[in-house]
């Protein structure tokens, strides 16, 4: 094997990464540093410390990255109203560049010459982790066990763990049949019955939300305060970025908001079905578009809408740390200087409805837009010349005999 002296492993403490830890020690005969990130996945991360210690790991990093995740990754993404393929709010994709960044930082701190991750050779995450790592540390070695070993089934992983004395839990019938990934922005479900695109997902699959049918019969109203494109307060109470998202997840989930069942196009070429719960993100997207509707110039808003699919694709395919994403981010952030104000929302049985928006930076002028007399604020006769000039090219073409019928 390649000459690797020390490797930083993205470690959850679960079966896969525990097997990877032992496999790295045996296969590469190297020292392993473990890194466990708390991104708000809702599971205790401290048990990973004891598991790593039991396997002889001396350098263990367990980092609470929730605030950084929302402040520096989720919020910047939502400033662009980012959606991949019309529906997916990129909950998994946006977490990977932060993990890659921290892996490289720890590698630099510990003198490690390699990093390792547990992403499979079929998915997008391998690309996201590694593109980020190479962008931040060009000479780093990346070890992806799923592309090297022959442990290609869960049963083989279990056998390997038992053979090498790795503590594992044999789950009974209550074990979820789905592959799940969670952070503060969302929780995803793949595999199991979802691999049949005609089979409806099971109701007990969902972890964060009630079904819209069982949501309260009374609507919930909330007000979100924006400053420079980011939410800074809920119902007038200022909160940190991570607290904002956590609270919106709780409120949205209680009202059956944020469920999604889609088939997406993976970067590696295949189609994949996934179900997602993104209650807070669903609310944030609706509210952000609402505050922009009164604060953004028309052409700026339209240009943002044109750029968004490219920006979304860059995040989905792992190019967060690319120069083109950084360039787009500067443009997006510049557009948010005047995106300030308050949005009022009605949450009811899976629906998010904007019922009010206001801002000191609003470009909406009721005196001009009114259907009543406007006191001369807008001269309707001016529209005739405007229409004639915009019709000029079409009239010329028609006069040349270029029929459209």
From Swiss-Prot:
<feature type="binding site">
    <location>
        <position position="179"/>
    </location>
    <ligand>
        <name>L-citrulline</name>
    </ligand>
</feature>
<dbReference type="GO" id="GO:0004055">
    <property type="term" value="F:argininosuccinate synthase activity"/>
</dbReference>
<comment type="subunit">
    <text>Homotetramer.</text>
</comment>
<feature type="binding site">
    <location>
        <position position="118"/>
    </location>
    <ligand>
        <name>ATP</name>
    </ligand>
</feature>
<dbReference type="InterPro" id="IPR024074">
    <property type="entry name" value="AS_cat/multimer_dom_body"/>
</dbReference>
<feature type="binding site">
    <location>
        <position position="264"/>
    </location>
    <ligand>
        <name>L-citrulline</name>
    </ligand>
</feature>
<dbReference type="GO" id="GO:0000050">
    <property type="term" value="P:urea cycle"/>
</dbReference>
<dbReference type="GO" id="GO:0000053">
    <property type="term" value="P:argininosuccinate metabolic process"/>
</dbReference>
<dbReference type="InterPro" id="IPR001518">
    <property type="entry name" value="Arginosuc_synth"/>
</dbReference>
<dbReference type="GO" id="GO:0005524">
    <property type="term" value="F:ATP binding"/>
</dbReference>
<keyword id="KW-0067">ATP-binding</keyword>
<comment type="pathway">
    <text>Amino-acid biosynthesis; L-arginine biosynthesis; L-arginine from L-ornithine and carbamoyl phosphate: step 2/3.</text>
</comment>
<comment type="similarity">
    <text>Belongs to the argininosuccinate synthase family. Type 1 subfamily.</text>
</comment>
<feature type="binding site">
    <location>
        <position position="124"/>
    </location>
    <ligand>
        <name>L-citrulline</name>
    </ligand>
</feature>
<protein>
    <recommendedName>
        <fullName>Argininosuccinate synthase</fullName>
        <ecNumber>6.3.4.5</ecNumber>
    </recommendedName>
</protein>
<dbReference type="InterPro" id="IPR048268">
    <property type="entry name" value="Arginosuc_syn_C"/>
</dbReference>
<dbReference type="InterPro" id="IPR018223">
    <property type="entry name" value="Arginosuc_synth_CS"/>
</dbReference>
<feature type="binding site">
    <location>
        <position position="188"/>
    </location>
    <ligand>
        <name>L-citrulline</name>
    </ligand>
</feature>
<feature type="binding site">
    <location>
        <begin position="10"/>
        <end position="18"/>
    </location>
    <ligand>
        <name>ATP</name>
    </ligand>
</feature>
<keyword id="KW-0436">Ligase</keyword>
<keyword id="KW-0055">Arginine biosynthesis</keyword>
<keyword id="KW-0547">Nucleotide-binding</keyword>
<feature type="binding site">
    <location>
        <position position="128"/>
    </location>
    <ligand>
        <name>L-citrulline</name>
    </ligand>
</feature>
<feature type="binding site">
    <location>
        <position position="124"/>
    </location>
    <ligand>
        <name>L-aspartate</name>
    </ligand>
</feature>
<dbReference type="Pfam" id="PF20979">
    <property type="entry name" value="Arginosuc_syn_C"/>
</dbReference>
<keyword id="KW-0028">Amino-acid biosynthesis</keyword>
<dbReference type="Pfam" id="PF00764">
    <property type="entry name" value="Arginosuc_synth"/>
</dbReference>
<dbReference type="GO" id="GO:0005737">
    <property type="term" value="C:cytoplasm"/>
</dbReference>
<feature type="binding site">
    <location>
        <position position="276"/>
    </location>
    <ligand>
        <name>L-citrulline</name>
    </ligand>
</feature>
<feature type="binding site">
    <location>
        <position position="125"/>
    </location>
    <ligand>
        <name>L-aspartate</name>
    </ligand>
</feature>
<feature type="binding site">
    <location>
        <position position="37"/>
    </location>
    <ligand>
        <name>ATP</name>
    </ligand>
</feature>
<feature type="binding site">
    <location>
        <position position="93"/>
    </location>
    <ligand>
        <name>L-citrulline</name>
    </ligand>
</feature>
<dbReference type="InterPro" id="IPR048267">
    <property type="entry name" value="Arginosuc_syn_N"/>
</dbReference>
<dbReference type="InterPro" id="IPR023434">
    <property type="entry name" value="Arginosuc_synth_type_1_subfam"/>
</dbReference>
<feature type="binding site">
    <location>
        <position position="88"/>
    </location>
    <ligand>
        <name>L-citrulline</name>
    </ligand>
</feature>
<keyword id="KW-0963">Cytoplasm</keyword>
<dbReference type="GO" id="GO:0006526">
    <property type="term" value="P:L-arginine biosynthetic process"/>
</dbReference>
<dbReference type="InterPro" id="IPR014729">
    <property type="entry name" value="Rossmann-like_a/b/a_fold"/>
</dbReference>
<feature type="binding site">
    <location>
        <position position="120"/>
    </location>
    <ligand>
        <name>L-aspartate</name>
    </ligand>
</feature>
């Amino acid at each position: 094997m390649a000459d690797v002296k020390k490797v930083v492993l993205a470690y959850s403490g679960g079966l896969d990464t525990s097997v990877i830890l032992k496999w790295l020690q045996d296969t590469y005969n190297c020292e392993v540093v473990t890194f466990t990130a708390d991104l708000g996945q809702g599971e205790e991360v401290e048990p990973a410390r004891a598991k790593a210690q039991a396997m002889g790991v001396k350098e263990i990093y367990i980092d609470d990255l929730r605030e950084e995740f929302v402040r520096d990754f989720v919020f910047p993404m939502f400033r662009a109203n980012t959606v991949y393929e019309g529906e997916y709010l990129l909950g998994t994709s946006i977490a990977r560049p932060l993990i890659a960044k921290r892996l490289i930082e720890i590698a630099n701190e510990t003198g490690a010459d390699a990093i390792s991750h547990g992403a499979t050779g079929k998915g997008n995450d391998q690309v996201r982790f590694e593109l980020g790592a190479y962008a931040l540390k060009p000479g780093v070695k990346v070890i992806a066990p799923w592309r090297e070993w022959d442990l290609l089934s869960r049963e083989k992983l279990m056998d390997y763990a038992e053979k090498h004395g790795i503590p594992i839990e044999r789950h009974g019938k209550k074990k979820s049949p789905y592959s799940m990934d969670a952070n503060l922005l969302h929780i995803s479900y793949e595999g199991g019955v979802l691999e049949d695109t005609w089979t409806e997902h099971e109701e007990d699959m969902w972890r964060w939300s009630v079904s819209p049918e069982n949501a309260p019969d009374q609507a919930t109203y909330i007000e979100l305060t924006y400053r420079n494109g980011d939410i800074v307060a809920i119902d007038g109470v200022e909160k940190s970025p991570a607290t904002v998202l956590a609270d919106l997840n709780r409120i949205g989930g209680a009202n059956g908001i944020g469920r999604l069942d889609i088939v997406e196009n993976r970067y590696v070429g295949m189609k994949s079905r996934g179900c997602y719960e993104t209650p807070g993100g669903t609310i944030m997207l609706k509210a952000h578009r609402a505050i922009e509707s009164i604060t953004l110039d028309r052409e700026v808003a339209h240009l943002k809408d044109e750029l968004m699919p490219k920006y979304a694709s860059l995040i989905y395919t792992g190019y967060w740390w690319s120069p083109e994403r950084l360039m787009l981010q500067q443009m997006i952030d510049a557009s948010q200087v005047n995106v300030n104000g308050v949005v009022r929302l009605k949450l009811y049985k899976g629906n998010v409805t904007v019922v009010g928006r206001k801002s000191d930076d609003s470009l909406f002028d009721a005196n001009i837009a009114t259907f009543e007399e406007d006191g001369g604020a807008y001269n309707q006769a001016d529209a005739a010349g405007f229409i004639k000039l915009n019709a000029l090219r079409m009239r010329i073409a028609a006069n040349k005999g270029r029929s459209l019928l």
